[in-house]
Amino acid sequence: MLRLDLQFFASKKGVGSTKNGRDSIAKRLGAKRADGQFVTGGSILYRQRGTKIHPGLNVGRGGDDTLYAKIDGIVRFERLGRDRKRVSVYPVSKEA
């Protein structure tokens, strides 16, 4: 009599790990001061990656492209042509 050794395949697929389940923390980018708001020198105006908004008058650009006020004054967000924006800080006139 013949004896057969049969090997059946698994009826259930092996369970792998999921590729979901992680999320990076927000970087808190964007405007930190509004148009027309009074700021002091050194105040952060806009946090960004790259130059989405360019520095204007009395505004500096940090190593991580953060825009900051160089003097005390009023913040103004302005357009440069059709597709560029800039932020400037204008000094407040001292009237008695």
From Swiss-Prot:
UniProt key word Ribonucleoprotein: yes
PTM description: The N-terminus is cleaved by ribosomal processing cysteine protease Prp.
Chain residues in the propeptide: 1-9
Pfam families registered for this protein in UniProt: Ribosomal_L27 (PF01016)
Record key words, sorted: Ribonucleoprotein, Ribosomal protein
Magnesium is among the record's keywords: no
GO biological process, one term: translation
GO cellular component, one term: cytosolic large ribosomal subunit
GO molecular function: structural constituent of ribosome
Domain of life: Bacteria
InterPro entries: Ribosomal_bL27, Ribosomal_bL27_CS
Similarity annotation: Belongs to the bacterial ribosomal protein bL27 family.
Identification of the protein by name: Large ribosomal subunit protein bL27
The species this protein was found in: Geobacillus sp. (strain WCH70)
Upper taxonomic lineage: Bacteria, Bacillati, Bacillota, Bacilli, Bacillales
Name of the encoding gene: rpmA
